[in-house]
Amino acid sequence: MKNKLVLILLAGGIGKRFSNKISKQMITYNDETILEKNIIFFKKNLKKISIQTVTNKNDFLIVSELCKNYNLLSPVLGGNERHKSVYYGLLAISKINPKYVLIHDTCRPLISSEVIKKLITYSKQEIFCVAP
């Protein structure tokens, strides 16, 4: 049975303005990386979901390990700009052919479960949605 809902987690940024050797999504907070916090949040709130991560070459091995640990789709490399990373994520899930796709910037982890549920409800009504 194919999954109708796929989440693309954009975790490919290098955080130029952040000025740190570690990518923002790999910063640890309360024993979990920002990426892990996103994975845990979405798996908890959306039970039937496949998650596709898009990352950069420097974090690829770490993200691959996280994907194995959390039973996610294999990560893909992103582009040098966000829209290219979205494109590569969409290419990666094209073989799954999901009915719904959510795209989330991993470094914006404070989205609420209520917003996610509204987005899914609206998308089922064929309303295209964006949450800032």
Give the residues covered by each predicted segment.
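Small/polar loops that bind or transfer phosphate-bearing groups
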Residues: 10, 54-55, 77-78, 103, ...
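Conserved beta-loop-beta/alpha segment of the NTase-like Rossmann-fold superfamily
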Residues: 81-132
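Short, glycine/charged-enriched secondary-structure capping and boundary segments
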Residues: 22-25, 66-69, 90-91, 115-119
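Catalytic tyrosine of NAD(P)H-dependent dehydrogenase/reductases that use a Tyr as the general acid/base
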Residues: 24-28, 78, 101
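Conserved N-terminal catalytic core of the sugar/cofactor nucleotidyltransferase
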Residues: 35-98
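N-terminal glycine-rich phosphate-binding loop and ensuing alpha1 helix
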Residues: 3-60
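Conserved beta-strand scaffold positions in the cores of enzyme catalytic domains, especially
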Residues: 26, 75, 128-129
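Short loop/turn elements that form and flank the Walker-type P-loop nucleotide-binding site
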Residues: 2-3, 97
